[in-house]
Design a protein with these regions (language model features):
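An anion/pyrophosphate-binding glycine-rich loop and adjacent beta-alpha core
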Residues: 1-16, 64, 68
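Glycine- and aromatic-enriched mobile tails/lids
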Residues: 18, 24, 30-216
Length: 216
């Protein structure tokens, strides 16, 4: 046994947190100017779509504490949106419900089938675990999209390579496996993080004039 070597850093969720990117959302009613408030806190310019954390612009430093706090604010506003009956026109058929249910629980099925093909430890050619996918996502975002490995800097070529690797990861996430409901939650967290990572990377690629390294 040897003592682990640590590189202490901020508690960021993904290596891309130091970017000037993100979607435009409504501010809180009590302090936001009229131009920055359109009905519900953290609602994007798309009606009924709420965002928080790395998906939202306005601040480059979306650390863990700020992200989950903003997520709580967005969730409360989304509940109020529903309570105000703004979502009443949304109709969901029984067929849509069943299809969505099948998609949500698919990681459990992936594991049930793939566990019989495990070649060693938790390695299976048929599925990847949420932690395996998360480590892969972290490596992509850290090395190509402005993480600590590159001193929070990136460029056109790195971002394009990062998007290519994220596309490959999305293909593999169709086969993410979950052995229980906790892992099912982790699987969907991973899918949402991967989608957020793609959005942030595409946005950073577009904003050539503000593709800046963090911590100026």
């Amino acid at each position: 046994y040897t003592n682990p070597e640590l590189t202490t850093s901020e508690p960021y969720v993904m290596g891309s947190h130091a970017t000037c990117s993100g979607a435009w959302v409504s501010g809180p009613e009590d302090i936001a100017p009229d131009d920055y408030f359109w009905g519900y806190n953290r609602m994007m310019s798309v009606e009924g779509l709420f965002g928080a954390g790395d998906t939202v612009g306005g601040s480059a430093h979306k650390f863990s504490s700020g992200s989950f706090t903003e997520g709580r604010l967005a969730a409360k506003a989304a509940v109020k949106y529903i309570e105000d009956k703004k979502a009443n026109n949304i109709k969901v058929s029984e067929n849509q419900y069943n299809n969505l249910k099948e998609v949500i629980y698919k990681p459990l099925e992936n594991y049930t089938v793939g566990r019989n093909e495990i070649t060693g430890g938790t390695v299976s050619p048929s599925y990847i675990s949420p932690i395996q996918g998360l480590q892969r996502l972290q490596k992509i975002m850290d090395e190509y999209c402005g993480g600590i490995t590159n001193n929070y800097m990136t460029n056109d070529n790195l971002l394009k390579k990062g998007l290519e690797l994220l596309d490959w990861l999305q293909e593999d996430l169709e086969n993410v496996g979950a052995e229980d409901y906790h892992q099912l939650m982790r699987a969907w967290e991973l899918k949402h993080r991967a989608l957020t990572s793609q959005c942030v990377t595409e946005h950073t690629l577009f904003r050539e004039e503000t593709r800046w390294p963090g911590y100026y």
